[in-house]
């Protein structure tokens, strides 16, 4: 099975990478960019027998810092 894990910063957590991208877009002449939030995407190919609990554990233990990040899992 193929999964996509999308990791984003929680609301209220400062995003310096997003702010740098927003500033760079403005410097390149792109107007109207009001906010940018950066995140990560992981695409995993796992055995069909892999449980949802195992995927959740992968996310919590390695792929996302659950103190400051949220994650969601999409089946591809």
What are these regions (language model features)?
Residues 2-43, 47-50, 54-76:
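Long, contiguous binding/interaction regions
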């Amino acid at each position: 099975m193929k999964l996509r894990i999308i990791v984003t910063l929680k609301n209220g957590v400062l995003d310096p990478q997003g702010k740098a991208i927003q500033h760079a877009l403005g410097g390149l002449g792109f107007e109207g960019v009001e906010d940018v939030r950066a995140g990560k995407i992981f695409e995993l190919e796992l055995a069909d027998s892999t449980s949802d609990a195992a995927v959740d554990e992968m996310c919590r233990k390695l792929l996302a810092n659950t103190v400051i990040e949220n994650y969601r899992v999409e089946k591809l």
